[in-house]
A protein has these predicted regions:
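A short, conserved, highly charged catalytic patch centered on acidic carboxylates
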Residues: 1-110, 120-146
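Short beta-alpha junction loops
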Residues: 114-118
Length: 146
């Protein structure tokens, strides 16, 4: 049974509290399941909506690997970068996400950084303007449920 938006958000908050001190690889597996197996957000791994650990080429080396890329109809929509949930946002985390957004093979306008909070970035490639929304992991948070 599919959850409504508030139920799905509250489930994520409960899970986050359980896994707050886990290492980044555990956090990544959990979020992969949230996007895929649980289908909390309406995406399907089977349909190719979710790409995990896809390598982005720079020169002759595969160096950049976003944690998750969400697609609709085989078109990349946004990238998700995951960090340990107990870690605060840092400039290097933000730079890493913005590097993915501006990568020539992606050039995406939206990125999500998940650490102690969820940060949603809107990046205007034409003027370099960045707007971000900060969403704390709080039960019944209206921004989280959206």
């Amino acid at each position: 049974m599919k959850l409504n938006y508030t139920e799905a958000w509250n489930f994520i908050v409960e899970e986050r509290n359980k896994f707050f001190n886990e290492k980044e690889d555990v956090v990544q597996k959990r979020w992969e399941s949230y996007f895929a197996e649980a289908e909390l957000f309406g995406y399907s791994k089977i349909k190719g909506d979710i790409k995990v650990g896809e390598k982005l080429h720079i020169g002759s080396k595969d160096r950049e690997i976003p944690d998750i890329i969400i697609c609709i109809g085989n078109i990349e929509q946004f990238v998700v970068e995951l960090k340990q949930l107990s870690f605060p946002k840092t400039n290097s985390y933000e730079l890493q996400l913005l590097t993915y957004l501006s990568h020539p093979s992606l050039r995406l306008p939206v990125g999500v950084l998940i650490c102690e909070k969820i940060y949603i970035y809107y990046y205007d490639h034409s003027d370099g303007k960045i707007i971000n929304l900060e969403i704390p992991f709080e039960k019944d948070n209206l921004n989280g449920a959206k």
